[in-house]
A protein has these predicted regions:
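Juxtamembrane intracellular "pre-TM" segments in multi-pass secondary transporters
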Residues: 5-14, 192-225
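Conserved MFS/SLC helix-loop-helix module at the cytosolic interface between two early adjacent transmembrane helices
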Residues: 68-106
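Helix-loop-helix hairpin linking two adjacent transmembrane segments in secondary transporters
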Residues: 108, 138, 145-192
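Cytoplasmic helix-loop-helix junction between adjacent transmembrane helices
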Residues: 112-150
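Intracellular juxtamembrane helix-capping segments at the cytosolic ends
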Residues: 122-134, 326-341
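C-terminal transmembrane helical hairpin of 12-TM major facilitator-type secondary transporters
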Residues: 284-332
């Protein structure tokens, strides 16, 4: 029996730190692939000589591919060896990223971006794999560490892509990403044991069970819709930030990517939000989080009244606020959803994140449209209304429950 199998079979030991780190790195590098384009949109648009609305389709189709991949591919982890799935999807993600880097025009980049989103859902296979490997007594800590890796991947993706695109070109970012994903995919194949499938149910029946879970659990529907609305504002902001900073402040993609550092508070708040949800209840955390998101976006209506340095400071402050609110609300919604049917957590997770990334795709599309037609105030209005709608939904859910 290998060392990994021995440790995974023991209920009293923790997984080795290097294994947990590899899982966290795999989740982070995989999900980062769907965010690299955002700080580079201005550079890509200029190279292909297309407008804001057209280049905004890149993040939209990436998010759409991710949402579809979660819905159609994530359930396969219940039926097949996750080790094999992680390797295959990782190699397909490498191919998609290379296609992005070698795209000769916008249409080719759009197709490759959709494929990138579809295959980047390997991150949603790595997180359940970590839960399956970890002994029960340390499972929460292990999954939390892997989720932190995923969130840090989202955060650093914008910072790294902004810098790489500015100094080496946007294509170099995709080539670098492909190399990193190839390395971590092979590393995961080497360290992971084989997984015994949890069910022999056919693939069509797995998909049908998703519909049953969605129809049966009202709490799931409300949580998914509320988080999806927050994702609309979140994605609208990040999908248009680089374009706005270039137009209004004449800042390059490296600076736009550096704004991702302001999201560190959001990434680091995930464990804290979970602890608070345990003490005061996840429903209250969702209300506070949605309210914080709404207020943070609304503050940016003050930008025209401020001098330029103060405008940048306010954008940073708002970014910290809404990122914190979005991540805290997500953790609380996961707590609500996972308690509904423990035996179906993978599928519940797939449904929740499908709606989240539909919101991401919608926000990217509407954000680009709003920026092109109404400027930055249009983006701020869209994001604020989406946050307010999420807050109203959580408030209504609480009143109905009472």
């Amino acid at each position: 029996m290998s060392a990994i199998n021995s440790i995974a079979a023991s209920p009293t030991e923790r997984l080795p730190g290097p294994l947990v780190f590899t899982l966290a790195a795999g989740a982070g590098l995989s999900v980062a692939s769907i965010y690299y384009s955002q700080p580079m949109l201005d550079i890509i648009g200029k190279q292909f000589n297309v407008g804001v609305g057209a280049v905004g389709m890149v993040p939209m189709l990436t998010q759409m591919g991710y949402a579809l991949g979660i819905l159609l591919l994530a359930p396969l982890g219940d039926r097949h060896d996750r080790r094999v799935i992680i390797l295959i999807k990782g190699l397909l993600l490498v191919a998609a990223l290379l296609l992005c880097g070698f795209s000769g025009g916008l249409n080719a980049l759009l197709i490759a971006s959709f494929a990138t989103g579809l295959t980047a859902t390997v991150a949603q296979d790595i997180v359940p794999a970590s839960a399956a490997l970890a002994p029960e007594r340390s499972r929460g800590k292990t999954v939390g560490t892997v989720m932190t890796g995923l969130l840090v991947g989202i955060l650093l993706s914008r910072v790294v892509s902004g810098v790489v695109a500015e100094y080496f070109g946007w294509r170099a970012m995709y080539w670098l990403a492909a190399a990193l994903v190839l390395f971590i995919s092979l590393a995961l194949w080497r360290v992971l044991p084989r997984f015994t499938p949890g069910t022999s149910v056919s693939y069509p029946r797995l998909l049908l069970s998703l519909a049953h879970l969605w129809q049966h659990h009202q709490t799931l529907r409300r949580a998914a819709l509320a988080q999806g609305l927050l994702s609309v504002g979140f994605s609208a902001f990040w999908s248009t930030l680089a374009l706005m900073l270039s137009d209004r402040f004449h800042l390059d993609s490296a600076v736009a990517g550096a704004f991702g550092l302001a999201g560190a508070a959001g990434a680091m708040s995930a464990p804290l939000a979970g602890s608070i949800a345990d003490r005061i209840g996840p429903a209250r955390v969702t209300l506070v989080g949605a309210g914080l998101v709404t207020i943070s976006f609304a503050l940016m209506f003050l930008l025209p009244a401020l001098p330029l340095p103060a405008q940048l400071a306010l954008i940073v402050l708002s970014t910290i606020g809404f990122d914190l609110g979005v991540q805290a609300t997500l953790v609380a919604h996961q707590t609500l959803v996972y308690s509904l049917a423990p035996e179906a957590r993978s599928r519940l997770n797939a449904l929740l994140f499908t709606v989240v990334f539909i919101g991401m795709a919608t926000g990217a599309a509407l954000g680009s449209l709003a920026l092109a037609r109404w400027g930055w105030n249009g983006v701020v209005t869209l994001a604020t209304l989406a946050g307010a709608a999420s807050f109203a939904l959580r408030l209504a859910s609480r009143h109905l429950k009472n």
